Amino acid sequence: MELKAYQKKVIADLNRYLQLLNETRDYAAAFHFFWQEKSAPSLGQYQDIMPGVPNLCFKVPTGGGKTFLACNAIRPIFDALPFTKTKAVVWLVPSDAILSQTVKALKDSSHDYRQKINADFGSRVEVYTKQELLNGQNFNPTAVTEQLSVMVLSYDSFRGRGKEGLKAYQENSNLEPFSKALGKPEFPIEKADETALFQIINQLSPLVIVDESHHARSELSLEMLKNFNPCFVLDLTATPKKESNIISYVDAVQLKKENMVKLPVIVYNRDNQGEVLTDAIDLRNRLEELAQSRPEQSEQYIRPIVLFQAQPRGKEESTTFEKLRDKLVETGIPAEQIAIRTSDVNELKNRDLLSPDCPIRYIITVNALKEGWDCPFAYILASLANKTSQVDV
């Protein structure tokens, strides 16, 4: 897959910054000179939230190909940094939905993301999940010196001290060869064993890619990032925080010019929840009739899906996902056409929504879109939640 014109500009901006970084040996000065060259010195005030570590941000709208941009950024960043024996990437994501999507794509040798990384690193690439790292599965001192090691991890599995988070701090006999090969850590992590996964990654001094980085600006998140001991931090987001060091930005008009916005966005405001419900059902039915009437339908199957956004539990008189399911059934919709997808309930697990054999036409969620869930058949979003955010749904 070739980079779009706006994506080429983003990578060109990154390369220019890296050139300036090599010339100045000062990441803040390089940032200042970069924006000075673009006649925008006011944008060149570097926010040093990670002292000693270059920290840049790509501001790209949702659907603009941030993941592919990150894949294209890995090689230039490593080429610009001082030589190291190991090349490790920590790829941080904010949710399990994005985690599974990213892991699946990066492990798939036929996927454009993996093909790009393979091309840049001579196919000497290994992609790891947290569990694979904990198990020492193809993860050892010899392997990490001979390949690019990409570790796809969730924020919560490293910034929390719950049961899952603690695994990264605990003694791990599977990783003992690392502690022998790497020696005493220069930057020991508090309360982490020398054989702990977190400490081993710390000693590899990885490039850290932070997907949806606006979710990683709390004190706990910054502590997590520092504990990774990164050589470089690259933020990816459509809605950067004010302390982000934006090195390149893309607007929605550029996406439209490159045909990245493939469908019109039509917004309706209804007076009450009943109208939202019935209008969404009617619109979905009309879309399915149109899809079935197309002569090419036999070659390209389409089953339009409504994504209903309900209120979280615990709010009195709110339309929670249980109540919403009951209302849909009361209108005559078969129960097998309805599924719930929340942080606690996932009725979509092991379901192929694109299969003609799948009956699901209505999915009830709370924060699935915010968490990165995606489905090509989900043409309609009907929100019954009381939303006030200006940047998410």
Positions of predicted regions on the chain:
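RecA-like P-loop NTPase motor core of helicase/translocase proteins
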Residues: 1-393
